[in-house]
Amino acid sequence: MATIRVPNEVPSPAQDSETLKQAIRGWGTDEKAIIRVLGQRDQSQRRKIRESFREIYGKDLIDVLSSELSGDFMKAVVSWTYDPAERDARLVNKILNKEKKKKSLENLKVIVEISCTTSPNHLIAVRKAYCSLFDSSLEEHIASSLPFPLAKLLVTLASTFRYDKDRTDAEVATIEAAMLREAIEKKQLDHDHVLYILGTRSIYQLRETFVAYKKNYGVTIDKDVDGCPGDADLRSLLKVAIFCIDTPEKHFAKVVRDSIEGFGTDEDSLTRAIVTRAEIDLMKVRGEYFNMYNTSMDNAITGDISGDYKDFIITLLGSKI
């Protein structure tokens, strides 16, 4: 379930555009007005506001927000205002364009996250947006930017179009659990069978396969993968893929937790988790967070951030400022 709260009566896109224009006109910026408009509009409404703003004022709202706002608040508002497919395409492009030594494993996990926690239609939209924005296919850019074992996995995951209904086949699950087990025992995590299964089967079928794996071999597949010798980075990305496929809400609960735990805050990761899930399943993420860490996600977040950034994030969490 989503957490954002859209008012019962919403102004027209033209009226919202005027409110935003007034909020950034002259000296100073009315950040609260920006939050009240954009933070309480759904994807379709935000798209219409952006279109209306361009028609009326001849400027891209994204460009205006980027120039008038600053810091983590600006990045969060801009990310939220983008069409989701464009947002994810730009996020992946930023990761792939980093210098080789700066392409950290944590960055690459974001590509896995996008590939394994979004709908088939959204992933297609991301690939289309990528081609349109960057004159390259997402798959080509991955293949040319990363070493073979990692590129092979990420291209497979990013190029999939999964069946999205909940029909499953128990016999297929048993057979493919055995194929996965064999590949792990042979220390072949990049075996074609592994990639074929993870890259073609529906989310529901894969979950059935993971259940069959635990039932037949007495251990979860992610633990078996974790104990497999070989490429540590490949092993880590496979574990993230399995986690995202099996329990996406737990994955994002962990992203939130990791972003605020310890010294300092990883605002980029926190923003990504909240912005990308606020219209999808952030309510479930909130519940999983409590189950996993025995504390309120909202309280943990708000105790770690401040200012306009905090006001915007709590608005996406469903609170009023």
Curated annotation (Swiss-Prot):
Q: Phosphothreonine-modified residues are where?
A: T117
Pfam families, A to Z: Annexin
On whether Phosphoprotein is a keyword of this UniProt record, the answer is: yes
Looking up Gene3D superfamilies in the UniProt record yields: Annexin
Annotated Gene Ontology cellular component terms: plant-type vacuole
Top-rank lineage group of the source organism: Eukaryota
Query: Which spans of this chain does UniProt mark as Annexin repeats?
Result: 11-82, 83-159, 171-243, 247-318
Phosphotyrosine PTM positions: Y289
Matching entries from SMART domains are given as:
ANX
Q: Which UniProt keywords apply?
A: Acetylation, Annexin, Calcium, Calcium/phospholipid-binding, Metal-binding, Phosphoprotein, Repeat
On tissue specificity, the annotation reads:
Expressed mainly in roots and flowers. Lower in stems and leaves.
List every position bearing N-acetylalanine.
Answer: A2
**GO annotations under biological process?**
response to cold; response to heat; response to salt stress; response to water deprivation
Q: Where does Ca(2+) 1 bind?
A: G26, G28, E68
For this protein, the record's PROSITE patterns field holds: ANNEXIN_1, ANNEXIN_2
One GO molecular-function annotation for this sequence? Answer: calcium ion binding
Say yes or no: keyword Metal-binding present: yes
Please report which protein family the annotation says this sequence is part of.
Answer: Belongs to the annexin (TC 1.A.31.1) family.
Q: What is known of its domains?
A: A pair of annexin repeats may form one binding site for calcium and phospholipid.
Q: What is this protein called?
A: Annexin D3
